Design a protein with these regions (language model features):
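Alpha-helical subdomain
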Residues: 1-77, 172, 177-343
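Conserved Class I S-adenosyl-L-methionine-dependent methyltransferase catalytic core
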Residues: 2-6, 14-41, 54-55, 61-176
Length: 343
């Protein structure tokens, strides 16, 4: 029998998560203020998202992330569908203000991440994974054994804190079979199967991560509860016969069209009454907070094709795919869980 994975940490690592999740926040301010003079122009002309994109020559996904981050920081406010520069932004981030901090942030504008943000805003193409020089984009790098092993381990370690919190809020009592879609190491499948009587789980991953998952599940003594199948979530139909689908820290890697595709595939594979569980960092209904989630979304925007989604956005996407009985609950370390039933 392996370790009890259902026990949470004895001390609080919340701030440690926030340092890592918000690592790129200052670089996004530097890129906007110095490369685009964003706040000076917005102060003279409030704009909606489409107008921001046209005026600054930027794309909707990164612009949406940027505006949510600025709103959470009290630098923009949304009124009547348009974004306005706040008094704070006017005083400290416009070029003609005597208290302008643009020269202060200009000392950061040559940082690699700040330069990446300028490119990402203009092209909507994520940068390479920041810890690896001369690497392929993240989605391609995950097909290589070395990168996949390191990345999977990085994501796996969070599960010892986030998994028990997910278990408390997921509402899986009485469920029998869970499919952990793009489940990485299988840590969340292991926690949920250990902590839910009668539940068995299957991790769906593409090579080489499927092999990594088998090894890690075996090391945790969970091979009797959790199995692994290989597959591509975008090319292959999802396996049938499960009454729970789990997307844990998956949807934030993808833009809306691919999120729609994944939710539709889930709906196609689930029988009525089955449950979808989306464990992630979610923005609020207005997409102007929580602050730390908007900062994390900036990091995700820079290295993946996705971002953090708002609770309202997820409700609409799930309803469109054929799910109802929407429920939202906070879990741990700025993460949360959304559940919905297949109609």
């Amino acid at each position: 029998m392996g370790p009890d994975l259902t026990r949470g940490p004895e001390t609080d690592p919340h701030q440690l998560y926030r340092y890592r999740d918000g690592l790129y926040a200052a670089d996004l301010i530097a890129a906007a203020a110095c490369e685009f003079d964003f706040f000076t122009r917005l102060a003279s002309e409030p704009m909606d998202l489409g107008e921001v994109c046209r005026s600054f020559g930027v794309h909707a996904r990164p612009a949406d992330v940027m505006l949510s981050f600025f709103a959470a920081n009290g630098l923009v406010r949304k009124d009547g569908g348009r974004f306005h520069a706040t008094a704070t932004a006017r005083e400290h981030l416009t070029k003609d203000s005597p208290r302008s901090l643009i020269p202060y942030y200009a000392s950061l504008k040559e940082r690699p991440v700040a330069k990446d943000f300028a490119v990402i805003l203009r092209t909507d193409r994520p940068a390479n994974w920041g810890s690896y020089k001369d690497e392929k984009p993240w989605t391609e790098a995950m097909l290589t054994e070395e990168f996949a092993t390191g990345f999977t381990a990085a994501m796996d370690c969070r599960g010892f804190t986030l998994g028990p919190a997910l278990l408390r809020e997921a509402g899986l009592a009485g469920r029998r079979s869970l499919l952990d879609i793009a489940g990485g190491s299988g840590i969340y499948a292991c926690v949920l199967a250990q902590g839910t009587p009668g539940l068995r789980a299957t991790v769906l991953e593409r090579p080489p991560v499927d092999g990594i998952a088998r090894t890690m599940i075996r090391k945790r003594g969970c091979e009797g509860l959790v199995t692994v199948v290989a597959g591509d979530i975008f090319r292959d139909p999802l396996p049938q016969g499960h009454d729970v689908h789990l997307f844990s820290n998956v949807l934030h890697d993808w833009d809306v069209p691919k999120v729609r595709q994944l939710l539709r595939a889930s709906a196609d594979a689930l029988a009525p009454g089955s449950l979808i569980v989306i464990h992630d960092a979610h923005l609020n209904e207005a997409k102007d907070g929580p602050l730390q989630v908007t900062a994390y979304s900036a990091l995700l925007m820079s290295v993946t094709e996705g971002r953090c989604y708002g609770v309202g956005e997820m409700r609409e996407l799930l309803a469109e795919a054929g799910f109802g009985s929407f429920r939202f609950a906070e879990t741990a370390c700025d993460r949360s869980v959304i559940t919905a039933a297949r109609l």
